[in-house]
């Protein structure tokens, strides 16, 4: 297994697909990396030489924020919004949808499991 950006990428998959196992690299970015380095996209990871794996590793380290750094950056952005006490920060703090979705009904993923309230007694 090749280890790139702290992730063991699967050896039996195509290079483009295998790179998407790294957090922060999607299909488009993987395709850009492969074409930039001149690696055939249909090649499998197990067929890559050590030099090619090193080239991929260096390209990712130089040009992209991935894995732990990306997760930390996203968490810091959310924390910054919460510290500013802006509308989006308050929504994050309360655990409600941030991007204007309705909350009268729905939003269960963000709000969590419904809390039962006493029903109407007959």
UniProtKB/Swiss-Prot annotation:
Pfam families, per the entry: Ribosomal_S13
UniProt cross-references to SUPFAM superfamilies, sorted A to Z: S13-like H2TH domain
GO terms of molecular function: rRNA binding; structural constituent of ribosome; tRNA binding
Domain of life: Bacteria
Ribonucleoprotein keyword on record: yes
Keywords: Ribonucleoprotein, Ribosomal protein, RNA-binding, rRNA-binding, tRNA-binding
GO biological process, one term: translation
Keyword Ribonucleoprotein on entry: yes
Spans annotated as Disordered: 95-122
Entry GO terms, CC: cytosol; small ribosomal subunit
SUBUNIT field: Part of the 30S ribosomal subunit. Forms a loose heterodimer with protein S19. Forms two bridges to the 50S subunit in the 70S ribosome.
Function text: Located at the top of the head of the 30S subunit, it contacts several helices of the 16S rRNA. In the 70S ribosome it contacts the 23S rRNA (bridge B1a) and protein L5 of the 50S subunit (bridge B1b), connecting the 2 subunits; these bridges are implicated in subunit movement. Contacts the tRNAs in the A and P-sites.
Protein family (similarity comment): Belongs to the universal ribosomal protein uS13 family.
Identification of the protein by name: Small ribosomal subunit protein uS13
Species in which this protein is naturally found: Zymomonas mobilis subsp. mobilis (strain ATCC 31821 / ZM4 / CP4)
Underlying gene: rpsM
